[in-house]
Amino acid sequence: MDKCNAKCKMPNAKSLMKIRFLKIKGTWREVADAARTTIRRDEGEGEPSTKWKKRILLAEHSPIRKLCFNWKWEDLPYWVSVHFVRHKYGIEHFVSTQRSDRTGEDRTAKTQDAPVVHECFANAQAVMFISRRRLCSQASPETRAAWKAVVEAIAEKEPEVAACCVPECVYRGFCPEFKSCGFVDTPAFKEAVAKYRTV
């Protein structure tokens, strides 16, 4: 188990959410070899370059799904957990039960912000896709804070993946939301887009 723990005080939350980054499954060599298979080449050797990693992540070719991440939120407000379980492609969720017959506590007495343990296992493409929704300023501040903690943990192990975790506007180059937060009209937006696209 990788030791990569972080605590985060969530906006308007009663408890201190904690994240544990458990492990990475798959290697960049495996990603590269899968890519080589698609062009009828034998397996290669060594670690792919940072530039190659960024390029295949931006292209979102299928081999990147061989790289997977496992993490766990602790004391995550239940309603924030519900936001995350809406994501279903390339990710699995394991959420602690609130059933009365399992916990010995009255489920009907629990509030929406009751803390839960929420573990996830997701591939690189799913992590990038979820980032587009959950790093957006239209996402709730609490959900955004929880997802930022995931991206920051990934950045310590796989910085190229974290560099491709951006909000929808940076990914598309414009804001598709009905009500924009205004970020697209700032110099910081142009800088973020340029940084995202740089290989």
Feature roles, as predicted:
Residues 1-199:
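Family-specific signature for flavin-dependent thymidylate synthase
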